[in-house]
Amino acid sequence: MAKFLSQDAIQKFKECFSLYDKKGKGKIPAGDLLTVMRCLGTCPTPGEVTRHLQVHKIGKDGEVDFSTFLTIMYRQQKQEDPENEIMVAMLMSDKQKKGVIPLKELRAKLTQMGEKLTPEEVDDLLKGVKVGPDGMVKYEEFVRQITLPVPDY
């Protein structure tokens, strides 16, 4: 799986992995896998981590070597596609398939569903979003805007 990851990503993963490799054996405790993965920006659930370990036949008291860790991270990153998840949710709301959603409805969804955002958080998300004269937002542009990578200063 390493061939699918950039050298920068592998280096970043190695640095974090090494922090949890307390014995210096090139392995981390399976119990630390969730924490290490989250430190590197993925959001696995405990159930997903358990499944990753099961796939590699590693018990919860076992250890994960770096090669296996790279495979797990690759698979986790591949399944976590926030842009696609949000687009699917928007498409489900767009009964007429016009590519737009009323700003009022978008605001309501963001504050009342899923991981509920505060009105202030929604205001921040909506900064710079183009709203048509009819009060409609092109949700593809909105999704692209909110899923842009965070600048690394």
Curated annotation (Swiss-Prot):
As part of the intermicrovillar adhesion complex/IMAC plays a role in epithelial brush border differentiation, controlling microvilli organization and length. Acts as a light chain for MYO7B and is required for efficient targeting of the IMAC to the tips of border brush microvilli. GO terms for cellular component: microvillus. Residues 8-43, 44-79, 81-116, 117-152 form the EF-hand domain. SUPFAM superfamilies: EF-hand. InterPro entries: CALM/Myosin/TropC-like (IPR050230), EF-hand-dom_pair (IPR011992), EF_hand_dom (IPR002048). Keywords: Cell projection, Repeat. Belongs to the calmodulin family. The keyword tRNA processing does not apply. Disulfide bonds: none annotated. GO terms for biological process: brush border assembly. Its main location: other. Associates with the IMAC/intermicrovillar adhesion complex. PANTHER family: CALMODULIN LIKE 4 (PTHR23048:SF45), MYOSIN LIGHT CHAIN 1, 3 (PTHR23048). Pfam families: EF-hand_6 (PF13405). This is Calmodulin-like protein 4. It is found in: Cell projection, Microvillus. The keyword Repeat applies. GO terms for molecular function: calcium ion binding.
